[in-house]
Every structure is written in C-alpha cells, then in structure tokens.
Amino acid sequence: MTLNINIDNFQGPFDLLLHLIRKNKMDIYDIKIFDITNQYIQYLNEMKEMDLEITSEFIVMAATLIEIKSKYLLPKTKEEEEEKEESDPTKELVSKLVEYKKFKLAADFLKNRELDYGEVFSKKPEIIDDRTEDADNKDILKDITLLDMYKLFEKLMEMYRSRINTNNSLPDKIAPDIYKIEDKMDEISEIIKSNKEIYFSNIINKCSNKIEVVVTFLALLELIKLKDIKVYQSNNFKDIYIERVSAVE
C-alpha cells in the first residue's frame, strides 16, 4: 500500500495513532493492536524513505506498540494472565489517547475561535466618571430668562418645520443625485479658506435635507483623508471643530 506522508500533519505519536484509528474506523476503546502496530511501523518506514527526521517520541510509541503486540502473541502462564488483568498496557494506552483527544479537540476549538475573531475589532469600554452629586435644575436655568427659552423653542420648531416633507405624493420620476461629494469638498474648502476655522454645525445648518447632510459629512471625511483639514471634538456628541491644515502648520 502506498502511503502519502506529511510529518507536519502529525503533532506527535498520539496524533498519528488517532489518525490511524479514524482511518480504520475503530472505536478508541476497542483498538485492534495488531493492525494499528503494523500500520504505524509502515508510516515510520515511509518517513525514513523520504528522509524525514523521526523524533524519539515516534520511536518510543512504536516500541510500546510492539511490546504490547508481543505480549499478545507470546503464550502466558496463569499468573501472567492474572497480572495482565490487573495492569493491561492497552488500557493505559487507550487512557492516554482519550486524554490526548480531549486536549486536541480543545486546541482545535481555540484555533477556530482565533481565526473567527482574528479580524474582529472591538471598541474599548469608556470610563464614565461617577457623578458625585446630581445637578441642580435651578443652577442650570439660573441665567436663562423666559424670553430666551421662547426664542430657543421657536428656533427648534423652525428647524423641525424646514425638515418636514410637505409633498405627500410620490414623483413619477426620481431625479438624479443633485449633491456630489466633490462639490461639497470644494464648498467646504472655500468656506475654510475664508474663515480658517469653522464648526460643522454651521455648514450642515445650510443643508436642505438629510441627503445633503450625509453627502456633506462624507465630503468632510474625504478632506480629512486627504489631510486638507483637521477636526477636533471636545467630547462625544459635541460640535465638530474644523480647521485648515495650513493654518495649523
């Protein structure tokens, strides 16, 4: 029988034994020691012919298998039969194989987990400072008059009304995109040239709809990628501060 051997596929003698057991469709608890020993020796001989280095672990396992096989072949006295029942070398080998199989399955599981999550990037947890005391609403509204609140409410309502779609009917034709990232990049660049620095909210407040806001934001990302501008944000959800690179440098 021709054997195709790759020693790298076996991480030790127990790995080779498990391969032979699977190949012969044997129960690990009912190993046919004669067949396994012969095939194991065949593997080692094939490795020699291929000039592969055979480690001492493989040779020790071969010697163990031959010893077990010889004990089955040689005639035994009654005392030896009783001694065999007490200390069966095959049982000891099977016990080690079972343990090795458990560790191999665990190693394969961990390897697959590494492959699955090797390209996954997780966000580090944020450290949220404990609030020592609750904010007092009176302090928050201390310098705000009723007129200020009314003006703020009117401003919010105006922003809300400007974004409502008043057209209840669907158009027969969908118009092509009127907003292009390249145009918005030029527009932002011109604004920065004049002002050197500006808040992102000042730009998007001029947008007429959500699509224009999205295109404007993508244009901002492209300018950052090209290193034409720098952006800063003091905290999460705060306004984005835009600054021209040349103004910094």
Swiss-Prot record:
One of its GO terms (biological process) is cell division. The keyword Manganese does not apply. InterPro entries: ScpA, ScpA-like_C. Keywords: Cell cycle, Cell division, Chromosome partition, Cytoplasm. Pfam families: SMC_ScpA. It is found in: Cytoplasm. Transmembrane segments: none annotated. GO terms for cellular component: cytoplasm. Its main location: cytoplasm. It comes from the Bacteria. Component of a cohesin-like complex composed of ScpA, ScpB and the Smc homodimer, in which ScpA and ScpB bind to the head domain of Smc. The presence of the three proteins is required for the association of the complex with DNA. Belongs to the ScpA family. Participates in chromosomal partition during cell division. May act via the formation of a condensin-like complex containing Smc and ScpB that pull DNA away from mid-cell into both cell halves. NCBIfam families: PRK00104.1-3. This is Segregation and condensation protein A. The gene is scpA.
